[in-house]
Amino acid sequence: MNIKSLLLGSAAALVAASGAQAADAIVAPEPEAVEYVRVCDAYGAGYFYIPGTETCLRVHGYVRYDVKGGDDVYSGTDRNGWDKSARFALRVSTGSETELGTLKTFTELRFNYAANNSGVDGKYGNETSSGTVMEFAYIQLGGLRVGIDESEFHTFTGYLGDVINDDVISAGSYRTGKISYTFTGGNGFSAVIALEQGGDNDGGYTGTTNYHIDGYMPDVVGGLKYAGGWGSIAGVVAYDSVIEEWAAKVRGDVNITDQFSVWLQGAYSSAATPDQNYGQWGGDWAVWGGLKYQATQKAAFNLQAAHDDWGKTAVTANVAYELVPGFTVTPEVSYTKFGGEWKNTVAEDNAWGGIVRFQRSF
């Protein structure tokens, strides 16, 4: 009887202990649902939604390596060897929809390195050098844009062809702080007005004028454009508040076929000197022209020619060949004739130069 009671008591104690341990056990919570990154196709390829928001983000950019030889076609100086330069450009774009329109941002950081034999390439620095620059940083809401961007005087009419040495005869400075508004109509018509701080020295210009405004009065830029399936025509006028002079450009683009297009641009400056922010060509006027021929799906031929009032003539041609998607090799040759008033500014009247660019865009 005692043994039976002992066994029953032990069993009861074990059951009670097991029940107590079960009551004290920690219950693991259910795992939260994983929120995968969603693709956003509202603003083009490469965007995705930032988790937990309705803002779309894209990370993109390029890696570039340039090898240059011959003369510097901007200054006429003999390089006496190869100049090499590399750049990593990191771009970040965002976009979202608001009750006031599309809200966008764009930033670009450039990490540059150069090993120049002659130290003549001001775009990357002299001798062996490296540096980082914030090239773009702007906010755009609808047609309103504020921040660091390129001047509307340069971009509204379009760049000077798809060549690397496109600004041997400069059509104006590039980077500036600005507030601009662009109106875009549904019939191909657009207009822009911009208040700008003044540009930097990215255009190959070597004068001494301080481009930035020296008071509260900004530089003012305005332009009109009409674009259709045949091409476009655009005009832009800029007032330089530092020297109190103005400059203007008119450009036309024509699409001959789907593969072949041509363009022509003329400019005039009231200052008649390149020592200014906008009219950086020599003399009163300058003219540029060019063409592009998409020979194959991978290869494109580009040509640009320019001439200014002081007698400088520049011609550049290249072939941009896409080896594989995202990787393009571009051999280019350029010629500059320093005639007229430009003769006194250079050691040689003629300059021949070449460059090969390797670029991976992503």
UniProtKB/Swiss-Prot annotation:
Keyword field: Cell outer membrane, Ion transport, Membrane, Porin, Signal, Transmembrane, Transmembrane beta strand, Transport
TM region positions: none
GO molecular function per UniProt: porin activity
InterPro entries to which the protein is assigned, alphabetical: Porin_alphabac
One Pfam family recorded for the sequence: Porin_2
Membrane topology term: Multi-pass membrane protein
A cellular-component GO term for this protein: cell outer membrane
Gene Ontology BP terms: monoatomic ion transport
Annotated SUPFAM superfamilies: Porins (SSF56935)
Annotated signal sequence range: 1-22
ATP-binding is among the record's keywords: no
Subcellular location: Cell outer membrane
Broad class of the protein's primary localization: membrane
Stated role: Forms passive diffusion pores that allow small molecular weight hydrophilic materials across the outer membrane.
Domain writeup: Consists of 16-stranded beta-barrel sheets, with large surface-exposed loops, that form a transmembrane pore at the center of each barrel. The pore is partially ocluded by a peptide loop that folds into the pore lumen.
Miscellaneous note of the record: The pore formed by Omp2a is larger than the one formed by Omp2b. Omp2b pores have optimal permeability to allow growth and protection against harmful compounds. The larger pore formed by Omp2a may be advantageous for intracellular growth, when the bacterium is competing with the host cell for nutrients whose concentration is particularly low within the phagosome.
Family: Belongs to the alphaproteobacteria porin family.
Subunit structure: Homotrimer.
Name of the protein this chain belongs to: Porin Omp2b
UniProt organism field: Brucella abortus biovar 1 (strain 9-941)
Organism lineage: Bacteria, Pseudomonadati, Pseudomonadota, Alphaproteobacteria, Hyphomicrobiales
Gene giving rise to this polypeptide: omp2b
